[in-house]
């Protein structure tokens, strides 16, 4: 394979010190040699979805830019916390805007989900709600291996903003390797 797979990360957290942000920032450093991982812009500036705004003003430039970067990528890694047993509102809002575009950026797109939390189950409930949403968008979600980073605060270095726990790094590296193989399998 001569060209690297282009993978983008979509961060579901808006918080500056986000543990999930730390996971996402670690991914480019541990990606297999056949893959390049780049972060998508923050979803913080995307306005709340409003069909009236869409009809009267069209799609926000932030949404159009996000969609184009997703379209250009070979795959998307969604890295997100779990809020109240589900998907964070900011991430759901970004997905709602993306779902309204005529040229669906996530349709047929390989997607990997990673969740982390300070609790022991690592955002598991969010993963399953997110999978339900992505079914509607016709995204191709990789089922296994899953990453649910429990007690993540003990596995990162807040000074460097990266994952430092070797077991977690090994799991994430293995998952990215599997995602690269998944992308190759489902590419049309």
From Swiss-Prot:
List keywords of the entry alphabetically: Flavoprotein, FMN, NAD, NADP, Oxidoreductase
Cofactor binding remark: Binds 1 FMN per subunit.
Deletion phenotype, per the entry, is: Cells lacking this gene show an increased sensitivity to chromate.
* GO CC field: cytosol
Care to name a GO molecular-function term for this sequence?
identical protein binding
Identify the cofactor(s).
FMN
Q: How does activity depend on pH?
A: Optimum pH is 5.
Per its Swiss-Prot or TrEMBL record, what regulates the activity? May be inhibited by divalent cations.
Reaction catalysed by this enzyme: a quinone + NADH + H(+) = a quinol + NAD(+); a quinone + NADPH + H(+) = a quinol + NADP(+); Cr(6+) + 2 NADH + O2 = Cr(3+) + superoxide + 2 NAD(+) + 2 H(+); Cr(6+) + 2 NADPH + O2 = Cr(3+) + superoxide + 2 NADP(+) + 2 H(+)
**Which GO biological process entries does UniProt record here?**
protein homotetramerization; xenobiotic metabolic process
What's the reported outcome of changing residue 125 to M?
A: Improves chromate reductase activity compared to the wild-type enzyme
**E.C. numbers:** 1.6.5.2, 1.6.-.-
What name does UniProt use for this protein? Answer: Quinone reductase
Lineage per the UniProt record? Bacteria, Pseudomonadati, Pseudomonadota, Gammaproteobacteria, Enterobacterales
């Amino acid at each position: 394979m001569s060209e690297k797979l282009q993978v983008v990360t979509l961060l579901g957290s808006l918080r500056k010190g986000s543990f999930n942000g730390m996971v996402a920032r670690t991914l480019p450093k541990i990606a297999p040699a056949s893959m390049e991982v780049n972060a998508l812009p923050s979803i913080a500036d995307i306005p709340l979805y409003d069909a009236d705004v869409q009809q009267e003003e069209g799609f926000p430039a932030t949404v159009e830019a996000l969609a184009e970067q997703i379209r250009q990528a070979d795959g998307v890694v969604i890295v997100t916390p779990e809020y109240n047993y589900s998907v964070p509102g900011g991430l759901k809002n970004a997905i709602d805007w993306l779902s309204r575009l005529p040229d669906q950026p996530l349709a047929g797109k390989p997607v990997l989900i990673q969740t982390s939390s300070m609790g022991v189950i690592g955002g598991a409930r969010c993963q399953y709600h997110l999978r339900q949403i992505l079914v509607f968008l016709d995204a191709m979600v990789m089922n296994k291996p899953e990453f649910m980073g429990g007690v993540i605060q003990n596995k990162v270095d807040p000074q460097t903003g990266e994952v430092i726990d070797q077991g977690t790094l090994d799991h994430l590296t293995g998952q990215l390797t599997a995602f690269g193989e998944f992308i190759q399998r489902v590419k049309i």
